[in-house]
Every structure is written in C-alpha cells, then in structure tokens.
From Swiss-Prot:
Organism: Homo sapiens (Human)
PANTHER family: CALMODULIN-REGULATED SPECTRIN-ASSOCIATED PROTEIN 3, PATRONIN
Record gene name: CAMSAP3
Name of the protein in question: Calmodulin-regulated spectrin-associated protein 3
Coiled-coil residue spans: 594-628, 696-729, 896-935
Polar residues composition-biased segments: 364-383, 814-825
Domain of life of the organism encoding this protein: Eukaryota
Length: 1249
C-alpha cells in the first residue's frame, strides 16, 4: 500500500492505492465504536500495538450465521476488569493504579469522568455481568480515554473561554495550521518578489504577473480552517500539523491541500496520518479510514484522545523525530490564548484561504476562528455523504482567475427553501467571470491586506440557524441567497433578494454591516421595512413597476403587504390576526378549510419535488462545469481577462442605464445609487460571459436553462401560495359573515402605497387590471419569498381559480373522475420575449383540478341557486375557449357589489347544504324503517316457495315513489351526481327484492350436495361481502349477476356504479349513527343473523357513507380466500402457458362455487397441485371442487397445512393440524394416494404372462 522513502532532503515518493472503504450506508456506527474502543484499550493495556497478541488484533469474529461477536479472550479480559487496571498503569505510570473495578470507578468519579449508561451510572456488577454488557464496558473505556486525554494535555494552552478539551485541541490544530499558512505565504511572496522588477512599471498588466508566478499559483495549497471535528475528515489539517512538527517525515508537498477535496484526496491524506500514527505513536492508530473519513458522533471521544496523543507526542514527550518547523510568532504549539492573529493574505495570495467566522464567537473585530468561544462545538447531526466529508470545509471566495473552483455556500441560492427542506449545503460552481466590476491589478498581489473576517457563516452556524427555534443571528455578509426578515439596520442596508442575475448584467452589492442582523420570522411591529429588494424600501418604485409588463413574471413583488416565508414553512404557521398588518381586514380569523389546504399542500409538495430534482441536476452540471474550469490553464484565462473586463463594464453601464429588466425580473432602479465595488458576498450568474472553450458555452446554457426552470417552478409555488392566500382570506364586505381566513404572517408596510387590498377582496382579481384598492401591482397581494430565484423572464403563469365557489366542491371529486394535474410544463428558453398582458401567447398553467358543469359559471350574475351549486362548473363565463384544465381569471371586471353577492350566495349555499344534509339523514332513517318492514314481510311470504315473485317485484315501486318528492327537492341542486345516487338506490332496492325472491329457488335447485348443505347453513349468505368488494374488475353484469344465486349482498346496482362509488365522496353530515342500524338486503330476521356480525363496507356504498366514528365490538365474520387462491394458482401452482387450460377450468369452478373458503390439495411437501377443495365451516369436511383426489377429506386425513404468501409467491407450512380460515393448502397422508399403487403390480403381474 505504501512505499516508504528515506527521510532525507530529497523528494519523498509515496505510492498509494485508493483503498476500498465502506460506503456511508453500509458503515455501522455502533460496530465502529466498539471496534475502535476495544482496539484502543487493548493497545493501552499491552503497552503498544506491537505487544498486543495476534489473536486479539481483531476483537470480533463471525459465526456461521454471519453474525459478529466479541472474541471469548477479549470477553474474559473485559469481565475480569484487569484490562482497565493494566491500561491505567501503562498510560499513567506516575499515578496510583486502581486495584479493582470498584476502585477504578471511584477514581474516575473523583476525576469528573463518571462512566454512565443511558439511564444510570455504571456499577461494578455491570462490569461483571454475563452475558457481557457491552454498553457498560464502552462507557468505562470512554471515561478512561477522557481521563488520559486530560492528563496528557495539562500543558495545552488556549483561550480561557475554551473550557472543553475538544475545543482546546481543535484550537491547537487550527493555530498550528494558521502559522503554517503564514509561513507558506511568506515563502511564496519571497519567491515571487525577485520577479517583480521584470514587470517594469506596468502594474496594470496582470497577464505578465500571472505568467511569472504561474507555477507558484498552480501549486498553492489551500489550508483548511478547523472549527469542529468534522473539519478533520479531509485529513488536510492533521497532515499539515504533522508536517509542522515532523517536516522531515512528511513534506508539505506530500499533503493534498486542495479546496474541493474529493474522497480520494481525503483518503490519501488520511492514509498519511494513519501511517504516521501507526509507526510513531505508542498506541498507533486504532481508528480505521472510515472512522477518520466519516467522523461519526459516537467516535468523538476516540478522535479527541487521538489528538491528545499527537499533542503529547509533539509537545510533551518530544522524541527525536520531532523537529519543529520554524513558524512565525514563535513556537507552533504556543498559541496566544487571547490574541491569536487572523490569517494573513487570504484574499489573493498564492495560498488563498478564506476564514469563516466561527459560529460561537462574537461578531466584533478580527479574530481567530476559535477565540473567545463559549459553549461546546455543535457537530452536525446529519451524516450524509457529502456533509460527512466536507461539511465545514471552508471555501475561498475571491480567488485569482486561475483558481476557479467549487465552493460551499452555507445558505443555498434559495435559502428559505433550502433551510426548510434541510439542505443547507449546496456545492456551487463559482467563476470570477462576470461576477462583478473589474478590480484593480494590485488586488491579486500576494501582499493584499486581508479582508474583514466574519463574512460568511460556517456550515455549523447554518445548521444552528436551521435547528434553533428562537430568533437567530444571521452571519455577517451572508450569501445573497440567505434571506431574513426585518433587519435592525432598517432600509438603509437592504439585502438582495436573489443572487441570480438577468443574463448579461452585473449587479453590485451594498456593503454589509459588521453587526449581524437579527433573523425574526414573526416580527412584532410592522413599522420596519423588510429588506426584500435593493432599492425597494428606501426608494419609491419606478412608474413602470405598475404596468403588467414589469410585474407579470416578477418573482418578488415590490411594496408587498405581508412578507411570507417559504411555502413549506407556511404550512406550520398558526392562524394569526391581520389587524396589526395595517390592511384593514376583519379581525376574526376562523380556521381555514383543512381539505382545501391539504390539497394545496399536496400540490405544492409535488412542485417542490420537481424543483429539487431540477436543482439537483443543475448542481451536477455545475460540478462538471467546475471540473472543466479547473482543467483549463492560465493561458485560457488570460484570453478571457480583457473581454471579461470590458463585458463587465458594459454590463454595469447597462444596469445603470436600463429600467426594469424585460418581464419584470428586476425592479426598476435596483442598481441606482449602489456602490460599484463588490464586497465578499457571492452571487451566481448563469451567464458566465465569454469563455475560451465551446464546451463552456454548452455548460453555461445548460446551467442557465436549469436555473430558469428552477426559478419558474419556484414562481409557480409562489403563485400557489398567493392563490391559497386569496382563497382562504376573510372577506371585507360589510354585512357578510367572514369565511375562513388564511394563514397570515403580519409584515411591514413600506409606505402609504404599500397597503394593498385584503386578499379576500382580490379573489377574482386579474393580472391585467388593477384592483379596487390603491395597489401598485395589478396582481396584489403578492406575498413573495425574498430569496426568489430570478432569471430571464419566462412566460409562465399559474392562474388561480376563476371562482372561489367552485373550490369547496373539490373534495367531492375523485382522482379517477377528475385527476389533480400536477404537470409543470417548463419553458427552457434562453431568450423569451416579455409577456404581453393582452395576448398571453405562451401561457402555461399548472391545473389544480377540473372545473365543472358549463351551467354554473355565471354565479353572482343572477343565476339560480341550483346552477350556482352545481358540481360541474365551466372554466369560462365569457365564452373564451377552455385550455386544458387550468384555472383562469375571467371575472376581473366585476365590481365589488357583485363580489359581495357572491360571498353572500356562498354562505347561503353552505346553509342550504347543511339543511339538506339534515333532511337526507331523516329520510335515510325513514328508508331504513321501510326496509326493515319490507324485509320482515318478505320473509313471511317466502315460506310457500317461488310464488312471491309476482308480488315482490311490484313492491319495489313504492319506495321510489315515496322518494320522488325528496328527489325533486334535492336533485336539481345536487345535479347529476345526486340523480345518479338516487337511481342507484332504486336499482339497489329492486335487486334486493330480486335476491330475496330467487333465494329459495337457488336453495332448492342448486345441486344435491351444495343445495342441501346450504339449506342447513343460515349464516352463509353474509360471507361474500368483503371478498366480492375486493374482487378484481370484471364485467359489469355478467359475472356479478351470477352472485345473486350465491346470496351475495353486493347488488347489481353497486356493481354497475362501482366506478362512481370510488369517487371518494365525503359527506360527514350524512353519516349513519352506527353501522348496526343498516340492514343488508340478505339479512333477514328469520336467518338468525346478528347485525354487527355481517357489517360489510360493500353491502351498500350509497347508503353507508364511510362511517369513521367509534364502533362496537364486531365479531370477525367469515372471509373468503378466493383471490388468494386465484393468485396462488396463477403465480405458483399452475403458472405458465402449459398449465393455463387447467388453471382456467379451476378458476371457472371457483367462480361457480358458492363457498367462501377454498383449499389446494398438494401431493406431498413438494407442493405439487392435485385438486381444489372447499371447506365446510360447520362439519369441517373438505369437498373436492376440481382436480384429482379423494371426494371428501376429513380432518383426520390431513397431514400438513400450508399458508400462501402473496408477496413472495410461495407456500409456507404451518406447524398446526387444525383447519381454519387462514389455511390455503393441505396435504393428506401418503397411504391415501391409491393412484399409482395398483399400476405397479399390474406391470409385475403381466410379465410372466
């Protein structure tokens, strides 16, 4: 694996093979913790890794079942507790050695490291318990490691605020790396200084300077900043520390110090560290490469003790191979506790490093990443692969052009979505092309003064912001994607809403304050403006902003009344009063309709999935783009340099001169009055300007298209948010009761013009005409997310529903009849013309559902109440052609009084529905009484025979006649759906009577065997309900009509309307009080059946509207395994074309049979099909239905029983002998098979003849 080299001054040559490691999903944290801890304690007890017996090198063994166990010798050592005492004696010989486990536990308790289980401290009995309690032993080992680390690092200096040993060790490593960085930069500057006079007096010619130090810049190392144990995962910090103390053993050129560290690079560095520890440290390196790479939280103590051993080796023991490198400011291991200097020359030097401000330090003044830290470092709770490798690696943001690499932005470009969705780390491709105005040439010299520290947050701080609920601090100068509400700085220093720029433009940033603004999700006062867009709060909007052209596709509305967070966060908000928002809306806020909000949430979740998929694809393309840029040399960037400077200047001039971007992607005046210098905040522009390679143009176009698609999806989600806000907002009309209000986060008002009308008043408002209120935007209110991604304008509009009255009916449609469409047609166009307000040529909508009957769209215009309440409303009342299934604004010209009439009609319809539900409930009770009386009368008349056929069929007519008034009263208002329901009930009544009439005939003429047996089984008529309800789709009349003869309760009407019954109709007001009050057609009083026995959801779907309330105890009724047998025959017993005729014959027999339980007869345990039997529930005899076998099988003949597993398509033998409803197959005793025994003697007897 490693080819060692002599430690001479010559170059070290090491050959490494990339080792095979376990992926993160296969890496077992608990197993890794046990292995590392046992290896450490064994090495500590035996005085070094070389003294451990070979049989104990691997503490685990694998048994024949592939299960890992601790080896018995290790177990014996742990149970005797001798191992711990020997480890104490070897590691701390100057201290008193505890003689027994109790003394050891007392000693650890005195030192403050009490080993504890999750619920209590470890006792001596736990250490001697058999079988071994590994958790107790691991707790003792952790306490030993902590005690040893404290003892070894007594001389470790550090800031007084750092009370944790982990913090002090990380501070030591970070300080050592910082000093090494300064030393390296000084050496690079000295090497570059002799070449400076060759440039002449032309500092404005950066190309010559780049040529001179091209070799140096190409090999410039990027030193990491260490703020947590996660930063050690790349191995760069540890390897650099080893180089500082042992430069002759590990040269700096041997260490991989790159900015985007791949897994192979990290493994290379970690192998260097592992080899050094194994060869130089007394206890070696008990951690595996996976442990060092993934840095799991359970191994935190193990990593800390490894750092402590390194410190003891380098600073306390100081063996011969430790030859400390001469670093600036004295000794490397003597960091100044309170005056640690910040890294120098970290902007444009040959070894660029950007130091992120540590999350636990105060924000004032330059400081070291760990100075003044209080509290504990928070390690990331997420262990995803990317985050485990480089969660807190720091990225350099202002590099030379020759070093354009990927960097990690702690907040994504759309940070409000990323924070909610839990994806705070997105690898973005950064390029210095067209990121800002051209900078002067000295900005790239190695002696550039450092920028102000504390510009961007660390990943840990981003996670802290995500996982903390109280008001949080946003890091100074956070990336533009990081959005926050209501900065304490006021409107003077607003933040950009989006880091995306329109193509061909460059957007300067305002200077960020050093004090971090406070992130307040729920502002208390609406007086402070929200820094939504540059120039929004401090400057009045341009006149062109009021035109639809400027606002039609703008993702962020200027002067919006309420600033909303992301769509995902919005679902978690409570219903808030809107009084303090200054909008004049009513104060009563009833709860929003749950069904409507759930549908909207489901649709938004699908849109979110699409957005994340496009974002992931965009990140992949950006990664490819970054790698491609890294492969380019200095000469390619030199060609780009002059064009970039001119292009950026033109872009800046264009931005200053132009008004709003076409399509309203950027408000007018956004760049006015802004400084031309760009600070350290980063933006990402899809258009990267001229590039030296054709491939870069393709990458740019792909990234731009994906970014455009992503922004359009997010605009769709925002329009969904606005639509839901309008639909659920309370009305303002006087004299009308307010409907359920929307979820509102009270926000600021930016001026007198900012108070837009209430969302409820804007329900039918349009994109094209301004509303009745003094709003600047024709589409108000726009509760946009400040971090909306903005790109080239796309003609993409999600138009809300035409009429709010159609929305309560959405819950009455089924996915089968009206599919909820979530198509999101994405226009990936590079140059899209601005959207014309009148023509709307490229209108793309995301339909929320279908609009219904063409007869009901003119609500509020004098249409009758019946037409208003129809379930099927048309998309357009103005005669415009209907496009797809989208909702469009068509009623934009209706005045306010018509809107008030609409609201009043909506309330009236709701009252009418409640009254109608009460009437329907009363009518159902009357109908049940009539059915009970008719059933009793028919039961008495059935005794003579089939004579009641003449009198029973006409009896079906009184019930429809009696229902006629109710039908006339309710039908016109309910529309087609209600009429179908009443017709279905009439059919149900007819079929019930026909079923009862034909039952005696079926019992008398159904065959000698089955008919007689059925006559003695009064309960058999109720057994098919649930089974037939689960039956696969067949012909509407043919196969189901035969079920009348099998006394099925599933009537013809429910079969013919089965598709309509699956509509998911929800009528909570028409629910029956209890399922026991419903009378199934086949439940006759003379059949001695109990109502609660046979409650089946398939008996009458029209009259049993999905009761979900409390139920009485229900005895389990006999269910059918017909379809399990069907599945077994089709996929297991008689699968394939060869057996298809036999399978079809048997399936026909199953369909003809009236039995509920079928069993397959196997020849023997090899499960060879022989016959199909039916089980009699009373006699427990099996009767052959088809196949070969005994005609009747008694329980004494059964040898084995089997159950079929539909998922695994196989039979499993049950260790029982009793037949039950869960048995699907059986075998009989071998001597009962008489088929082949007579044939063998015949052959033998025929040979003498």
């Amino acid at each position: 694996m490693v080819e060692a080299a002599p430690p001479g001054p010559g170059p070290l040559r090491r050959t490494f093979l990339v080792p095979e490691i376990k992926s993160l999903d296969q890496y077992d944290f608990s197993r890794a913790k046990a292995a590392a801890s046992l290896a450490w304690v064994l090495r500590a007890a035996f005085g070094g890794a070389e003294h451990v017996p070979p049989e104990l090198w691997e503490p685990f063994y694998t048994d024949q079942y592939a299960q890992e166990h601790v080896k018995p010798p290790v177990t014996r050592l742990l149970l005797s507790a001798e191992l711990y005492c020997r480890a104490w004696r070897q590691a701390l010989p100057q201290l008193e050695t505890p003689p027994n486990p109790s003394a050891l536990l007392a000693l650890l308790a005195r030192r403050g490291t009490v080993p504890a289980l999750p619920e209590r401290p470890v006792r001596e009995a736990d250490l001697r318990h058999q079988p071994i309690l590994m958790g107790a032993h691991l707790a003792v080992i952790d306490a030993l490691m902590a005690a040893f680390a404290f003892e070894w690092t007594k001389t470790l200096p550090g800031p007084l605020a750092l009370t944790s040993l982990e913090h002090k060790l990380l501070f030591w490593v970070d300080t050592t790396v910082r000093r090494l960085q300064e030393k390296t930069e000084q050496e690079a500057a000295q090497r570059a200084s002799p070449a400076a006079p060759a440039d002449g007096a032309a500092p404005a010619q950066p190309s010559i300077r780049y040529r001179k130090d091209r070799v140096v810049a190409r090999r410039a190392p990027c030193f990491p900043t260490v703020t947590s144990l996660q930063d050690l995962a790349s191995g760069a910090a540890l390897a650099a520390t080893i180089h500082c103390y042992c430069p002759q053993l590990l040269r700096l050129e041997e260490v991989c110090l790159k900015d985007p560290m791949s897994v192979a690079d990290s493994l290379y560095n970690l192998q260097l560290v592992q080899d050094f520890c194994a060869s130089r440290l007394p206890r070696g390196c008990p951690l595996s490469l996976e442990d060092l790479l993934y840095v799991p939280p359970p191994l935190k103590v193990n990593l800390v003790v490894m750092l402590a051993e390194l410190f003891m080796c380098f600073e306390v023991l100081k063996p011969d191979f430790v030859q400390v490198k001469d670093l600036p400011d004295g000794h490397a291991a003597s960091p100044r506790g309170t005056e640690a200097s910040p890294p120098q020359n970290n902007s444009g030097s040959s070894s660029p490093v950007f130091t992120f401000r540590h999350p636990l330090l105060s924000s004032g003044g330059p400081q070291s990443p760990l100075r003044g830290s209080t509290g504990s470092l928070k390690s990331s709770p997420s262990m995803s692969h990317m985050e485990a490798l480089g969660k807190a690696w720091n990225r350099q943001l202002s590099r030379p052009l020759s070093q354009a690499v990927s960097f990690s932005t702690p907040f994504g470009l759309d940070s409000d979505v990323d924070v909610v969705m839990g994806d705070p780390v997105l690898l973005r491709s950064v390029s210095s092309d067209s990121l800002g105005p051209p900078r002067p040439a000295p900005a790239r010299t190695p002696t550039q003064p450092p920028p102000e520290p504390g510009d961007l947050p660390t990943i840990e701080e981003a996670l802290q912001i995500i996982h903390s609920a109280e008001p949080r601090l946003l890091p100074d100068g956070a990336a533009d994607g990081s959005f926050y509400l209501h900065s304490p700085e006021g409107p003077s220093k607003p933040s950009l809403a989006s880091p995306y720029l329109p193509e061909g433009t460059s957007k300067p940033l305002s200077d960020r304050p050093t004090k971090a603004p406070v992130y307040m999700p729920h502002p208390e006062t609406p007086s402070k403006p929200s820094p939504c867009l540059v120039g929004e709060a401090s400057k009045p909007p341009a006149p062109s902003e009021g035109s639809p052209k400027a606002v039609a596709s703008s993702p962020a509305a200027t002067n919006s009344e309420v600033k909303m967070t992301s769509f995902a966060e919005r679902k978690k908000q409570l219903v808030k009063a809107e009084a303090e928002a200054g909008a004049g809306s009513p104060t009563s806020t009833p709860a929003p309709p749950e069904a409507l909000s759930s549908e909207m949430s489901e649709l938004s979740a699908r849109l979110e999935e699409k957005r994340r998929a496009i974002e992931a694809q965009k990140r992949r393309i950006e990664a490819i783009f970054a790698k491609h840029r890294q492969r380019l040399g200095k000469s390619a960037f030199l060609q780009v340099q002059p064009r970039e400077a001119s292009g950026e200047a033109e872009a800046e001039a264009e931005e200053a001169d132009s008004g709003p971007v076409p399509g309203g992607e950027r408000p007018a005046g956004e760049g006015q009055g802004e400084p031309t210098s760009r600070p350290k905040a980063v933006t990402f522009s899809p258009d990267l300007g001229p590039v030296p390679h054709e491939g870069l143009g393709e990458y740019n176009r792909a990234v731009s298209k994906l970014s455009a698609a992503l922004s359009s999806l997010q605009r769709d989600m925002q329009r969904l948010t606005d639509q839901q806000q309008r639909l659920l907002a309370p009305p303002e009309a006087p004299g009308s009761a307010p409907p359920p209000a929307a979820w509102v986060i009270p926000g600021p008002t930016t001026g007198p013009k900012a108070a837009s009308p209430s969302p409820a008043r804007r329900v039918p408002a349009t994109r094209r005409s301004p509303g009745p209120g003094p709003s600047q935007s024709p589409r108000s209110p726009k509760h946009t997310r400040p971090a909306e991604l903005r790109l080239a304008p796309l003609t993409r509009v999600l138009t809300p529903p035409h009429d709010v009255d159609s929305l309560p009916h959405l819950r009455k449609f089924s996915p089968s009849q009206v599919p909820v469409q979530t198509r999101s047609s994405i226009l990936l166009a590079e140059e899209t013309p601005p959207e014309e307000p009148a023509a709307r040529p490229g209108l793309i909508e995301i339909p929320l559902g279908s609009l219904a009957d063409p007869a009901a769209e003119d609500e509020g215009d004098g249409s009758p109440a019946g037409a208003e309440d129809s379930l099927e409303e048309e998309a357009s009342s103005e005669g415009e052609p209907r496009v797809g299934l989208g909702f469009f604004y068509k009623d934009e010209d209706k005045p306010e009084d018509e809107m008030a009439q609409k609201r009043a009609s909506l309330l009236e319809r709701q009252q009418r529905r409640a009254e109608e539900a009460r009437r329907r409930k009363q009518w159902q009770e009357v109908e049940k009484e009539q059915r009970r009386e008719e059933a009793a009368r028919l039961a008495q008349e059935e005794a003579p025979g089939p004579a009641p056929l003449v009198s029973a069929v006409p009896m079906a007519t009184p019930a429809p006649a009696a229902r006629a008034p109710a039908e006339e009263e309710v039908g016109p208002r309910k529309g087609d759906f209600t009429r179908q329901e009443y017709e279905r009930r009439a059919q149900l009544k007819l079929m019930d009577d026909l079923d009862k009439v034909l039952r005696p005939r079926a019992a008398g003429s159904g065959g000698p065997g089955r008919g007689g047996r059925r006559a003695t089984r009064p309960r058999s008529g109720c057994c098919d309900d649930s089974a037939l309800a689960r039956s696969p789709a067949r012909g509407l009349l043919g196969s189901r009509l035969s079920k009348i003869y099998s006394q099925s309760t599933l009537s013809l009407s429910t079969v013919a309307n089965e598709a309509h019954n699956n509509l998911g109709v929800k009528r909570p007001t028409s629910r029956a009080p209890s399922p026991s009050g419903l009378m199934s057609p086949s439940r006759l009083p003379g059949s001695r059946e109990r109502d609660w026995e046979n409650g089946s959801n398939a008996s009458s779907p029209a009259s049993v509207p999905e009761y979900t309330g409390p139920r009485l105890y229900k005895e389990p009724s006999a269910k059918s395994n017909k379809f399990i047998i069907h599945n077994a025959l089709s996929h297991c017993c008689l699968a394939g074309k060869v057996n298809e005729p036999q399978k079809n014959r048997i399936l026909e027999e199953i369909e003809k049979s009236k039995a509920n339980h079928f069993l397959i007869l196997f020849r023997d345990s090899s499960c060879q099909f022989r016959a199909l039997y039916t089980l009699s529930g009373e006699t427990e005899e099996l009767s052959r239905l088809a196949g070969y076998g005994p005609r009747t099988v008694t329980p004494a003949m059964v040898e084995g029983i089997y159950k079929y597993n539909s998922d695994r398509k196989r039979f499993t033998q049950i260790p029982a002998k009793t037949m039950s409803m869960s048995v699907d197959a059986f075998t009989i005793q071998g001597h009962l098979w008489q088929g082949k025994k007579p044939t063998t003697p015949k052959k033998g007897g025929g040979t003498p003849k």
